[in-house]
Curated annotation (Swiss-Prot):
EC numbers: 3.1.-.-
Active site: 34, 115
Lineage: Bacteria, Bacillati, Bacillota, Bacilli, Bacillales
Pfam short name (any one): 2_5_RNA_ligase2
Keywords linked to the UniProt accession: Hydrolase
Motif (HXTX 1): 34-37
KW Thylakoid (keyword) present: no
Family to which the UniProt record says this protein belongs: Belongs to the 2H phosphoesterase superfamily. YjcG family.
Organism the protein comes from: Oceanobacillus iheyensis (strain DSM 14371 / CIP 107618 / JCM 11309 / KCTC 3954 / HTE831)
GO MF annotation list: hydrolase activity, acting on ester bonds
SUPFAM superfamilies attached to this UniProt entry: LigT-like (SSF55144)
Protein name, UniProt field: Putative phosphoesterase OB1230
Motif HXTX 2: positions: 115-118
Length: 170
């Protein structure tokens, strides 16, 4: 089965992201707005049990932190994806690193760019128009991160929470 690890932002940020995703993200219905910490990976029952134990340990050792979103950005020219750019901070980078070392495979296909996708799979003209409009809008979003989620993928390709891990606690 496929699993992944993500942070779900507050309802305020999810609502703002979803207002755009409904129109500009064909995968809108598959997963709520999120910040991916670890891309999808395969795990069987035994591996999953070990993964959950390791995630508990990492969560306990990680203190909650704040994230800041001040603008939109893009992965152009690689893809026509537009996202809320999460300002990189040490705590977030450390959490990401812990999920790609030790008992975890380093399955990264790209450098870690903390973000919340708001538009993807756009035609070039639409991409340029939307990006230009969103770059003129001011964004000043802050969130308190005190947990992350282990997700699994269903047969219809949607993702659902398997378990939540609260930071700084058993």
């Amino acid at each position: 089965m496929k699993y992944g690890i993500a942070i779900f932002p507050s309802k305020t940020i999810q609502d703002q992201a979803n207002a755009l995703r409904k129109r500009y993200d064909p995968r809108y219905s598959l997963i709520p707005p999120h910040l991916t910490l670890k891309e999808s990976f395969e795990a069987d029952e035994e591996t999953l049990s070990e993964t959950v134990e390791e995630l508990r340990k990492i969560a306990k050792e990680t203190e909650p932190f704040h994230i800041q979103i001040n603008k939109v950005s893009t992965f152009e020219p690689v893809t026509n994806t537009i996202y809320f750019k999460v300002e990189p901070i040490q705590q977030l980078n450390d959490l990401h690193t812990k999920l790609h070392e030790g008992k975890f495979d380093d399955n990264q296909t790209h450098p870690f760019v903390p973000h919340i996708t708001i538009a993807q799979d756009l035609e070039h003209d639409e991409f340029s128009d939307i990006l230009g409009r969103l770059q003129m809008e001011g964004f000043n979003l802050e969130d308190y991160v005190d947990r992350f989620q282990l997700l699994y993928q269903l047969d219809n390709e949607s993702w659902t929470v398997y378990q939540t891990f609260v930071l700084g606690r058993d």
